[in-house]
Amino acid sequence: MDSDDEMVEEAVEGHLDDDGLPHGFCTVTYSSTDRFEGNFVHGEKNGRGKFFFFDGSTLEGYYVDDALQGQGVYTYEDGGVLQGTYVDGELNGPAQEYDTDGRLIFKGQYKDNIRHGVCWIYYPDGGSLVGEVNEDGEMTGEKIAYVYPDERTALYGKFIDGEMIEGKLATLMSTEEGRPHFELMPGNSVYHFDKSTSSCISTNALLPDPYESERVYVAESLISSAGEGLFSKVAVGPNTVMSFYNGVRITHQEVDSRDWALNGNTLSLDEETVIDVPEPYNHVSKYCASLGHKANHSFTPNCIYDMFVHPRFGPIKCIRTLRAVEADEELTVAYGYDHSPPGKSGPEAPEWYQVELKAFQATQQK
């Protein structure tokens, strides 16, 4: 973000003083192909100016005696933005970062261009990390916390570079000037980063998620022949994360090559990975660390599957409400099977889904 190091002027467009130095508003192109547009006073940047770097990023602010001072805006090549406080050309002081969609992803302090002090990292799903960063600006220490999307439930303890090593259930009681105050909850459950593999769903399959446990329960579904279903414990508004969908991680090829009977609890995570909750883990007596796989299908669902970065499970999907949901209401999602796969006459879906689809389409035509 500091482009002044060993930069050699290649071309100057604008007024020059008697010594041939940029003076007034000028555009200076450097040997690195970086470009600066702004005000100069006898060869030094003074006043508003903007760097255009070779990689597509930019840095804009107010220069005094050739150095950026005060508020500056660095725009990454992908469109993300860092708004920070500069002293003598380096980040020193409060800063905020935003992603390409304008969502806040970082809030904290910088010292000599490195994150410093208590910092917050925000995920698009609503969760966050908070704590005092180490000398390298990393979320490493004994007093770091992951805060769930309710901005209250937390896992507090030891993290290394943002990865939970040992967390205990806590409640975020208050935040004063960016500093959080946590209160540890009774109990001796310990949580740690436990990303599943193709063969291990969890090293502690019967340890429930504390956030999920407050919001959902499993009971007999109200949908005919659907078995168990997922229900809301509490009344919530729209866009609320209710449950998590963890499972073993397998490939799309593996899913596509086996019988539909084995794919009852599969959910695509991305182009490479499918999350699966196979036997015997579809029984809560064998696995209850996450319950999202218990949500049944509906063509008029009250929830959706959404991406989620979980402190324990890693990248997974969650179940998020589409609308307000009442206590004891069953949570449903659209399974999203392909209704018109190429080269096939009918949908690529299990038989029960095809039957329900025809019935639903019939009601829509009335």
UniProtKB/Swiss-Prot annotation:
Catalytic activity: L-lysyl(4)-[histone H3] + S-adenosyl-L-methionine = N(6)-methyl-L-lysyl(4)-[histone H3] + S-adenosyl-L-homocysteine + H(+); L-lysyl-[protein] + S-adenosyl-L-methionine = N(6)-methyl-L-lysyl-[protein] + S-adenosyl-L-homocysteine + H(+)
InterPro entries in the cross-refs: Hist-Lys_N-MeTrfase_SETD7, MORN, SET_dom, SET_dom_sf, SETD7_N, SETD7_SET
Record annotation: effect of changing H297 to A/G: Abolishes methyltransferase activity
A molecular-function term among this protein's GO annotations: protein-lysine N-methyltransferase activity
The protein's Enzyme Commission number: 2.1.1.364
Positions with a binding annotation for S-adenosyl-L-methionine: A226, G227, E228, N296, H297, E356
Matches recorded under Gene3D superfamilies: Histone H3 K4-specific methyltransferase SET7/9 N-terminal domain, SET domain
PROSITE patterns, per database record: SAM_MT43_SET7, SET
Disulphide bonds in the chain: none
Top-rank lineage group of the source organism: Eukaryota
One annotated Gene Ontology cellular component of this protein: chromosome
Similarity-based family: Belongs to the class V-like SAM-binding methyltransferase superfamily. Histone-lysine methyltransferase family. SET7 subfamily.
Assembly mode: Interacts with IPF1/PDX-1.
Record comment regarding domains: The SET domain is necessary but not sufficient for histone methyltransferase activity.
Name assigned to this protein: Histone-lysine N-methyltransferase SETD7
Source organism of this protein record: Homo sapiens (Human)
Lineage per the UniProt record: Eukaryota, Metazoa, Chordata, Craniata, Vertebrata
GN (gene name): SETD7
